[in-house]
Amino acid sequence: FDFHGPSIEEAKKRANEKGLTNLEFFVSDAGEIPKNDYDLACIFDAWHDMGDPVGIAASIKETLSKDGTFMVVEPMALDGYANNIANNPASAMMYGFGTLVCVPASKAQSVGLGLGPQAGPSKLMELLSEAGFGNVNLAAETTNNLVLQARG
């Protein structure tokens, strides 16, 4: 699911070229995904751009099976501005991107939280909990990304 039609068309084309038949791609707003007992839902480097990340996560929770997992991959960030600047070499660049691209995109949408790409793991996990997930953890961390897992 993606709201960007050209991306969905490209995904369909590539899947067809590779002979993959067990995949489906749909143009859809994240808040309008049909309930279908999915085992896994993922958002890659985009949750912070969404105007209502809590509402979208809650909507995704409703699409998951009882044991389903929501995986959120976000840009690497540490908790706390000073800590992030001091210990995350990419943070200054990411704050710049966030100021010019991510936050304005979020603010232009419904709710307009303006999370930005440097929220840090604690804030991201807090928002997933607000969305109704009972089991939220930082599953992996690389120099470029945080990977969060939300279940139940």
Where are these regions (language model features)?
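C-terminal alpha-helical "lid/dimerization" subdomain adjacent to the S-adenosyl-L-methionine
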Residues: 73-131, 137
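Conserved SAM-binding strand-loop segment of SAM-dependent methyltransferases
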Residues: 18-30
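A short SAM/SAH-binding and catalytic strip from SAM-dependent methyltransferases
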Residues: 39-54
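Conserved SAM/SAH-binding beta-strand->alpha-helix loop
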Residues: 4-6
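A short acidic, Gly/Pro-enriched loop at the edge of an enzyme's catalytic core
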Residues: 28-41
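Conserved SAM-binding loop
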Residues: 11-12
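A short glycine-rich, Lys/Arg-flanked "PGG" loop and its adjoining helix->strand segment in the class I
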Residues: 54-67
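Core SAM-dependent methyltransferase catalytic element
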Residues: 129-152
